[in-house]
Amino acid sequence: MPENTDLSHEEYERAANYWKEKDAQSKKLDQDALKKTVEEYIQANNTCALATAAGDFVRCTPLEYTYHDDCFWIFSEGGEKFYALEKNKNVCLVIFDKYEGFGKLKGMQVTGLASIVEPFSQEYVQAADFRKIPLKALEKMPHPMNLIKIKPKKIEFVNSDFKKDGADSRQTLICD
C-alpha cells in the first residue's frame, strides 16, 4: 500500500484557490433570480449539516432547520457544537440532495454567523411558532431549548439545472 504524502504549501494554495479562479471566469445568474432559486431550495428541504469549530475542536451535526427572515433557525437541546459556538460564531451549514450523477447535482454551502437567541424572547417565541412548536411544551421542559440563529454571509449553490439557463452550475450569492 502506498504511503500517504502531504502536499506542499503551494499545492495546498492551488487546491484552495481552484474554485475562486474558476468562479472568476464563470457565467453568472442574475442575483435576484439566484436568490429566488436559493430560497426555493432552502424551503424545499429541512435538514442540514452544521459545522462548528474552535481551535482544534471541530463538530459537524445533522439538524433540522427552518428558514425565514433571511436566517436559518435551529432548535437544539444541546451538544458539543456549543463548545465551539461559545468561542467562534462563524459557522458553515450544508444542504444537499442524494448524489445521482453529475447532471443532477444539487447542494449548497452556507457560510454565516451564529447567535444564540434568548429563551422565550419575542424572537424565540416567533421562531417556535414558525416551527409549530407549542410554547407550552417548551415551557414544560426542564431546561429551555437552545435556539441557534444563523445569518448567512455567503451561499454557494451547485445546481446542474443552472446550465439550462446558460450559466455555470456553481453560483455564489453574497448576502447582506
What residues fall within each predicted segment?
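Serine-centered coil/turn micro-motif
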Residues: 79-80, 121
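Short Pro/Gly-enriched beta-strand edge/turn motifs at strand-loop
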Residues: 43-49, 129-132
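Short, basic/aromatic recognition patches
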Residues: 27-47
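Charged, gly/pro-rich active-site loop segments
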Residues: 1-29, 105-176
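Helix-adjacent hinge/juxtasegments
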Residues: 81-115
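Charged, amphipathic alpha-helical segments
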Residues: 31-35, 78, 132-133
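Structural motif
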Residues: 71-72, 90, 113, 154
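Short beta-strand segments
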Residues: 45-78, 93-97, 106
